[in-house]
Design a protein with these regions (language model features):
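Short amphipathic alpha-helix that is part of the acyltransferase structural core
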Residues: 1-33, 145-189
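Active-site rim helix/loop that mediates acceptor-substrate recognition in acyltransferases
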Residues: 11-59, 184-221
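Long, hydrophobic/aromatic-enriched structural stretches that serve as scaffold segments
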Residues: 47-98, 104-107
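A conserved beta-turn-beta hairpin within the catalytic core of GNAT-like acetyltransferases
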Residues: 57, 61-72, 81, 227, ...
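Conserved acetyl-CoA-binding loop-helix of GNAT-fold acetyltransferases
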Residues: 76, 82-95, 123, 261-279
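Conserved active-site alpha-helix within GNAT-family acetyltransferase domains
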Residues: 87, 99-105, 109-131, 289-307
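C-terminal "cap" of GNAT-fold acetyltransferases
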Residues: 135-168, 296-317
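Extended, charged low-complexity segments
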Residues: 214-216, 235-317
Length: 317
């Protein structure tokens, strides 16, 4: 067995012996394999060869949004697993991490709950810090929840379209992201960069809805009601691939967020979900830290209105 740095063409060679990616996370990690870089983001990638044929790869890299850990990923061809190759690659990544520019050496990864990777990660000293699920909601499956109105029948809430370039929306997205990632706090960053990461054309965002509350009082003061929940829709990256055809039952990926301090957060979530999934299926990512959303998703799963399409753990060493 020989080990060497990643070089151009390794991805094509590995795809000849690797099966399809087991999850979206695995596909994303595969896309992160690249030659070593000392620029931002710093990266080191290794390849394991057996008799001159690439059979495994591993990478470790920094990110500017989450700086307390380095991302790490190891994948070995199924026919060569349980032979110590993954362990050797991980040990080499740990040694390479000693030279990261930030000085951070702790590793973080994401593993599918049903995969052998969980057992491997725990055996290598990693521990689970969060569970993440991608959940599919079928068209028309979410019960409708009426918007509030006052005694005169005037609406005190409103759902409206909002530009993805909105500073107000960007701030709400960032507030939600920080509150839902206290288990792995993001670094402080500008709203401009937040917009680029989550709401830009580059991020494949193509539309957004918001739920506003107390709109009558706000309007009387020349303002709009405060945003209590939001939903951002994304185009799948595969849309840019030549010959890609959208399946009839394809679901739209949605980032669903809400005000953690809003007493009626669960109701607000349903008020957003119902119109979103009225005619077409959607997928939503939910973590254990999103307690109100997680509880509602569990209820929808029990009702048969939702199903888990991906279930993974974030692990750190």
């Amino acid at each position: 067995m020989t080990f060497r740095p990643w070089q151009e063409g390794d991805d094509l060679e590995l795809l000849q012996i690797w099966p399809d990616a087991e999850s979206t996370s695995a596909a994303t990690f595969r896309a992160s394999f690249a030659p070593d870089s000392d620029e931002s983001p710093w990266r080191r990638t290794l390849v394991a060869e057996h008799k001159g044929v690439a059979i495994a790869a591993a990478t470790v890299y920094e990110t500017s949004l989450h700086t307390e850990h380095l991302w790490a990923y190891v994948e070995v061809a199924p026919d060569h697993r349980r032979g110590g190759i993954g362990t050797e690659l991980l040990e080499r990544l740990r040694r390479l991490a000693q030279d990261s520019p930030s000085g951070v050496v702790s590793l973080r990864s994401k593993v599918d709950v049903e995969s052998d990777a969980v057992e491997f990660a725990l055996a290598q000293g990693f521990k689970k810090i969060q569970r993440t699920r991608v959940v599919r909601l079928e068209a028309g499956s979410v019960p409708g929840v009426l918007l509030h109105q006052n005694d005169e029948g005037e609406m005190t809430q409103a759902i409206e379209d909002i530009a993805t370039g909105s500073v107000e929306l960007t701030q709400k997205v960032w507030d939600f992201y920080q509150r839902s990632h206290q288990w792995d706090p993001p670094a402080q960053t500008s709203l401009g960069r937040v917009n680029r990461l989550f709401l830009s054309d580059e991020a494949e965002a193509f539309g957004a809805l918001v739920l506003r509350d107390d709109v009558l009082s706000a309007r009387a003061n020349g303002k709009k009601g405060d945003i209590k929940a939001f939903a951002v829709s994304y185009r799948p990256l595969e849309h840019d691939m030549p010959g890609f055809e959208v399946e009839d039952d394809a679901a739209t990926e949605v980032l669903l967020g809400y005000d953690f301090d809003y007493p009626q957060a669960r109701e607000a979530i349903l008020q957003m979900l119902s119109p979103l999934a009225a005619q077409y299926p959607v997928t939503v990512e939910v973590t254990e830290s999103m307690k109100d959303l997680s509880i509602l998703i569990d209820q929808l799963i029990k009702m048969g209105a939702a199903s888990v399409v991906e279930n993974s753990f974030v692990v750190v060493d």
